[in-house]
Amino acid sequence: MAKKSGDVRPKITLACTECKERNYITKKNRRNNPDRMEMAKFCPRCRKHTAHRETR
């Protein structure tokens, strides 16, 4: 079966705001968080904790 494009829990990619490397893949609930997600995560390229923002 094919997945719906308007899925409630889509996979999203989190990219580092400093070096722009895409480090993490996670899921989010579109009903609870309709805007772009931002989290503090460890970036192995920067070697420190930075803000990671959802990419399209």
Curated annotation (Swiss-Prot):
Q: According to its record, what are the GO cellular component terms?
A: cytoplasm; ribonucleoprotein complex; ribosome
GO BP annotation list:
translation
Q: Where are the transmembrane segments?
A: none
Q: Does the keyword Disulfide bond apply?
A: no
The source's superkingdom equals Bacteria
Protein's UniProt keywords contain Hydrolase? no
Under Gene Ontology molecular function, one entry of this record is: structural constituent of ribosome
Alphabetized, the UniProt keywords read: Ribonucleoprotein, Ribosomal protein
The record's comment on protein family reads: Belongs to the bacterial ribosomal protein bL33 family.
Q: Which HAMAP family match?
A: Ribosomal_bL33
Name under which the protein is recorded = Large ribosomal subunit protein bL33A
Species of origin: Cutibacterium acnes (strain DSM 16379 / KPA171202) (Propionibacterium acnes)
Lineage start: Bacteria, Bacillati, Actinomycetota, Actinomycetes, Propionibacteriales
